[in-house]
Swiss-Prot record:
CDD domains: fungal_TF_MHR, GAL4. Residues 349-360 have a biased composition (Polar residues). InterPro entries: TF_fung (IPR050815), Transcription_factor_dom_fun (IPR007219), Zn2-C6_fun-type_DNA-bd_sf (IPR036864), Zn2Cys6_DnaBD (IPR001138). It is found in: Nucleus. This is Depudecin biosynthesis cluster-specific transcription activator DEP6. Residues 16-43 bind DNA. Pfam families: Fungal_trans, Zn_clus. Disruption phenotype: Affects the expression of all the depudecin cluster genes and impairs the production of depudecin.
Length: 646
């Protein structure tokens, strides 16, 4: 094996074949690089690469450059010379004259060198029996019914739709005595490699088109992107009535409608690799038409508000948190002006308020009695509520919507949002109870989860106040009650098939961990008995294991990239993954019997694989758990890398 003249005799000149294929950094160590050694994978160096001379390499680069120049020349000559229609000219002029902060930098899939995880996600290309072994086993007194999951081994290849075998109950009550000593069968399974769909990630900035102008999209392209959105992304964030959207996009030329047309297309771009080059166009036009709504006083249009939500969501996924905060802050102020947070206030109370505030601004949405349109307005408001909670979780900024006690708007109704929907009368956020009726959807469940999480955050920041323990106990009870209310969405079938239910479950468990983390910190500050700390740690660890099991239910398939729920819900599940890693870190530091530690390490590896799947190694959430990765490496070195075959 040749070594690099610039390196040491113990390094190769080029990366190993596996690292080259994944386009990740390789330390080129001989005889086996550290990444392959960690993953227990075969490591080999192609001798052909070692024998290439500098002239051969230069020739290859020149050939690639010539092909690129030829392709650019073809694209230039193929540009249409005909005069654009008036509407498209207006879009181009608008794009060049009015801009917000600016469009993202250009996305070139081959230019981004994203770290492929040291811990690759196993794929679902294995049989269902293997998946059952991945999910592993628990102690007999663990309330998670994983026996049903292990039963999948007898149904290899069976569809998960409607299968009772996948309907395992992931619901847990703290009073049931959950045990965190969990043994995972995946500790003896090789972790199959899956390239993390790097080019589909939205954490690379996009660049503005040349000369600050935007190229418009054809109606065919827009229709294709809209279909991508409504057939995949929509179900993870369902607040737009597709029937109304389809009718208005063809019959209205208002800037609000046009802004929403491009915003929906922008969201559709996120699920298709070949559409990445259209993101810059959609993003720029969506923002420019949204700016035009303010310039031309089209503020009282639901389309404008929905466009802001989709733009803010895209910016958050792009790691442009400051920009997303401004966009969603604009949407929050618009909701206040339109009084969406009080849209279900009683007529008598509404009349009194109108008389009290008649000197204020008179901005309002057009009056309607259409129940479907009213339901769409509610879902739009709650969509903003959920997005704002993400920004606060990520940044710590203040919540910009009205305080919860001032919200007089009903929860989202069950049913697909379309023209034939008959919405149910739903309670408000403050009037919800543990009664089984009315039906609470997973989308409404996310609203309830966000309200609980915000209360937990506030209590965690007030550890010095005398009422901390009272509030902590009340929040633990409220968490138990919420699990009972949402139990129908917290089974394996729902978590596999419903992206909203998946993120709902993970965030509920993460909220549990956050509450217990606050209690652990308070215990340590007050010097309370170690038994109280151990109880909080046990509960947090149990929740972390259950997050890991839910992730195991949604392992991505290389043949169904568009159904990758982990990637689809990336913006909402990074925090739960991080909280679970922190809880398991404490368990790893504490140590214990070998079976328990093996289960902890296996879970940490799978959680890191999921986090690497949705974020770069230098991302915010990775920086929050650097101590966990360091501890895992220390454990690996101490155990000579032979305790786990992952």
């Amino acid at each position: 094996m040749r070594s690099s003249s610039a390196g040491t005799p113990f390094t190769a000149q080029y990366a190993c074949e596996i690292c080259r294929e994944r386009k990740v950094r390789c330390d080129r160590a001989l005889p086996k690089c550290r990444r392959c050694d960690r993953l227990n994978q075969p490591c080999s160096y192609n001798q052909a690469h070692q024998r290439r001379t500098r002239d051969e390499q230069l020739k290859q680069l020149q050939e690639r450059l010539a092909k690129t120049e030829a392709q650019l020349a073809m694209n230039t000559t193929a540009a249409p010379l005909s005069v654009r229609s008036q509407s498209r000219s207006e879009g181009t002029e608008l794009a060049s004259s009015t801009r917000w902060i600016g469009t993202p930098d250009s996305f070139t899939p081959n230019s981004c060198s994203r770290r492929s995880s040291q811990y690759q996600l196993p794929t679902t290309s294995t049989s269902q029996s293997q998946l059952g072994s991945v999910l592993g086993t628990t102690a007999a007194n663990t309330p998670m019914d994983l026996d049903n999951i292990r039963g999948m081994s007898a149904t290899s290849g069976m569809s998960t739709n409607g299968s009772s075998l996948f309907d395992s109950d992931l619901f847990t009550s703290f009073t049931e005595g959950a045990d965190s000593n969990m043994t995972f069968a995946w500790t003896n399974q090789p972790l199959m490699a899956l390239e993390p769909l790097d080019n589909m990630l939205l954490n690379r900035p996009q660049s503005a088109p040349p000369n600050g102008s935007e190229e418009d999209l054809s109606p065919t392209d827009l229709s294709l992107l809209h279909n991508h959105y409504f057939e995949s992304v929509y179900f993870s964030f369902p607040f737009i009535n597709r029937d109304r959207f389809t009718a208005e996009k063809t019959g209205s030329r208002s800037p609000a409608t046009t802004a929403l047309v491009y915003a929906v297309a922008l969201a559709g771009c996120t699920r298709s690799l070949q559409d990445h080059n259209r993101q810059s166009t959609c993003y720029g036009l969506a923002r420019n038409y949204a700016e035009r709504c303010e310039q031309e006083d089209h503020l009282n249009d639901l389309n404008f508000l929905q466009a802001l939500l989709l733009i803010g969501r895209f910016e958050a996924m792009n790691r442009k948190l400051e920009r997303s905060g401004l966009t969603l802050g604009r949407a929050a102020m618009l909701c206040k002006l339109l009084k969406l947070h009080q849209m279900d206030k009683s007529e008598h109370s509404q009349g009194m308020q109108n008389r009290e505030t008649q000197s204020g601004p008179r901005l309002a949405l057009p009056h309607t009695k259409d129940p479907v349109l009213l339901e769409e307005r509610r879902r739009t408001f709650w969509g903003l509520y959920i997005l704002q909670s993400y920004v606060r979780t990520r940044t710590g900024w203040e919540f910009q919507l009205e305080d919860t006690k001032n919200l007089q708007i009903n929860l989202p109704s069950p049913g697909l949002l379309r023209s034939d929907l008959e919405p149910l009368k739903m309670p408000s956020l403050l009037n919800i109870s543990t009664e089984p009726a009315p039906e609470i959807t997973s989308y409404a469940g996310c609203v309830l989860m966000v309200e609980l999480a915000l209360r937990c955050f506030d209590n965690g920041q007030k550890r010095d106040t005398p009422g901390f323990w009272d509030d902590y106990c009340a929040l633990v009870k409220k968490t138990d009650d919420l699990f009972k209310t949402l139990k129908r969405h917290l089974n394996a079938t729902s978590i596999r098939e419903d992206p909203v239910a998946f993120s709902l479950y993970l965030n509920l468990r993460a909220t549990e961990i956050f509450s217990h983390d606050s209690a652990i910190t308070k215990n340590e500050e007050q010097g309370l008995p170690p038994l109280m700390v151990a109880e909080s740690q046990r509960r947090a660890t149990t929740a972390a294991f259950q997050i890991c099991s839910a992730v195991g239910l949604n392992l991505p398939s290389p043949w169904k990239a568009d159904s990758d729920i982990i990637m689809l819900q990336a913006i909402f599940i990074a925090w739960p993954l991080t909280m679970a890693l922190k809880a398991l870190y404490r368990e790893l530091v504490r140590g214990g019997i070998r079976e328990t530690v093996n289960g902890v390490v296996a879970s940490i590896r799978l959680l890191f694989a999921a986090l690497d799947h949705i974020e770069e190694s230098d991302g915010h959430w990775h920086q929050c758990v650097t101590n966990v990765e360091a501890k895992l490496q220390e454990w690996d070195e101490k155990n000579s890398f032979d305790s786990l075959a992952l």
